[in-house]
A protein has these predicted regions:
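Substrate-binding cleft of carbohydrate-active enzyme catalytic domains
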Residues: 2-201
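Substrate-binding groove of N-acetylhexosamine-processing glycoside hydrolases
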Residues: 80, 89, 132-150, 171-382
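Disordered, acidic Ser/Thr/Pro-rich linker "stalks" and the adjacent N-terminal cap
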Residues: 362-429, 440-449, 469-480
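Short beta-strand elements bearing conserved aromatic residues within extracellular beta-rich modules
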Residues: 453-455
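Noncatalytic modules at the cell exterior or secretory-pathway interfaces
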Residues: 489-491
Length: 491
């Protein structure tokens, strides 16, 4: 019922493809009659939610276990959804993950892993012929359920670690003349593509399928930015653009201190609307190869149907207009007014969209430039900041601009696994009454508050007088993004 209610909205707002992510390490969600163990075991976890599974050992259990939580779609239910979507002129594209994100399969069929043991590997063993027998049997049943042009095979985030030490994978590489594990993955993707093509279907995969060489007729779904899709299109392959910083609906959409816990990033309605998936600057040879744009909702942190709707709507309206509207016809103010009307319409019909009209918007502290003694002054970094969290460079701490909600907004400096020692040089002796700095914590981004901040002053940059040490009272287990000013006030 939930899926069909979302399909109703997709049809209303002209979203014409439903990409159904049916398998992942956290659970197998489609009935495969040849392999009942997939829905007897791999679809169930002895934890109440994804959090418990992810941090509690990533185990599975039988469906009759008293602690079992999970489920799957029967083949009859899938046929019902596919037909419901067809009547709305929506094509349903299934995804069966391979070779990575396959912990749930390998827990049930450990012989398909490189180690031969459950709970060791997350990738299928590509050197094992049984792997291809299993995948082709699964895909045959999937093809029988979904009449879609494309079958999505995942292809993302394979660890490839097991392949590096696996005798079977080594033998496969020697036999096929493959020089590294990237080419080994490419071999698998090409072989699966040949199987799908023989069944009259086309292969679609995440942009990692570019690694090691792209299969001849593959279509790339670009999520790690736009580079993968552009590279595929330039090489004559079709691409679907879904870069995470514009299209990932599991990202927080407003003040993270009041919104539900979300993935470790930030995406506002306005940012989603600002995306142009096929700008003319890409060139006449590339633009026609870009098929469209897609919004993605990953549900690790989304435990209920109401929460899912809160994350999808109204940002999916922005995705729809990005796909259908020429850039020169887009007007965010006009769109925003219509989005508010749509939110009211959805609420009247029992949906649970984000209440856009009451959005906090940008972090208030980030809106007004700060003028103080340190503005524009030199910072001496005795501990270099990480290139991964470089903000706007050396002047970031004294440019007067405070960070927003998003650690990736080029205003937050970060350090990896080290204490930090730095000096703000005021250039001359001056009276100081307050010293302060903002810090943030993002549990799912592995960004943490300092244990403590020590403030000291010096006349010569050699001998420092401690003023105060301010401790941190936010536990590392706190999952909500949070922000805190550490400061000293005195004379």
């Amino acid at each position: 019922e939930f899926v069909e209610r979302q399909l109703d909205l997709m049809a209303r707002y002209k979203l014409n493809r439903f990409h159904w992510h049916l398998t992942d390490g956290a659970g197998w969600r489609i009935e495969i009659k040849k392999y009942p163990a997939l829905t007897d075991i791999a679809a169930w976890r002895p934890y109440p939610d994804w959090e418990g599974w992810n941090f509690g050992g990533k185990r599975y259990c039988r469906r009759d276990d008293p602690a079992a939580d999970g489920g799957y779609y029967t083949q009859d239910e899938i046929r019902e959804v596919v037909e419901y979507a067809r009547a709305l002129h929506i094509e349903v594209i299934p995804e069966i993950e391979m070779p990575g994100h396959s912990e749930e399969v390998l827990a049930v069929f450990p012989e398909l892993s490189c180690s031969g043991k459950p709970y060791v590997n997350s990738d299928f063993c590509i050197g094992n012929e049984q792997t291809f027998e299993f995948l082709e049997n699964v895909l045959s049943e999937v093809i029988g359920l979904f009449p879609s042009e494309y079958i999505h095979i995942g292809g993302d985030e394979a660890s490839k670690q097991g392949w590096r030490t696996c005798p079977k994978c080594a033998a496969r590489m020697r036999k096929e003349g493959l020089k590294d594990v990237d080419e080994l993955q490419s071999y698998m993707i090409r072989r699966i593509e040949t199987f799908l093509n023989a069944k009259g279907r086309r292969l679609l995969g995440w942009d990692e399928i570019l690694e090691g060489g792209l299969a001849p007729d593959a279509t790339v779904m670009s999520w790690r930015g736009t580079e993968g899709g552009i590279a595929a299109a330039a090489a004559g392959h079709h691409a679907v653009m879904t870069p995470s910083n514009y299209c990932y609906l599991d990202f927080c959409q407003d003040d993270p201190t009041t919104e539900p816990v979300a993935a470790a990033a930030f995406l506002t309605l306005e940012q989603a609307y600002s995306y142009d998936p096929a700008p003319d600057s890409l060139g006449a040879g590339v633009v026609p190869m870009i098929l469209g744009v897609q919004g993605n909702l990953w549900c690790e942190h989304v435990p209920t149907a109401e929460h899912a709707e809160h994350m999808m709507w109204p940002r999916l309206l922005a995705v729809a207009e990005v796909g259908w509207s020429a850039p020169e016809r887009k007007d965010y103010d006009d769109f925003y007014a219509r989005a508010l009307d749509a939110v009211a319409w959805l609420q009247e019909r029992g949906y649970h969209p984000f209440d856009q009209k009451n959005a906090v918007g940008p972090r208030p502290e980030s809106l007004e430039p700060l003028r103080c003694l340190s503005t524009g002054k030199t910072v001496i970094y005795h501990t270099p900041y990480s290139p991964k969290y470089a903000a706007a460079g050396d002047g970031s701490l004294t440019d007067g601009l405070r960070g927003g909600w998003n650690y990736g907004d080029r205003r937050w400096l970060g350090w990896l696994d080290t204490d930090v020692d730095l000096v703000v040089d005021l250039g001359e002796r001056q009276p100081v009454r307050r010293i302060a700095a903002d810090f943030m914590q993002g549990f799912y981004a592995d960004i943490w508050m300092p244990r403590a901040v020590e403030f000291s002053v010096s006349d010569d940059n050699e001998h420092f007088t401690p003023l105060a040490t301010v401790g941190n009272d936010i536990p590392v287990e706190f999952k909500q993004d949070c922000y805190r000013e550490f400061g000293w006030t005195g004379q």
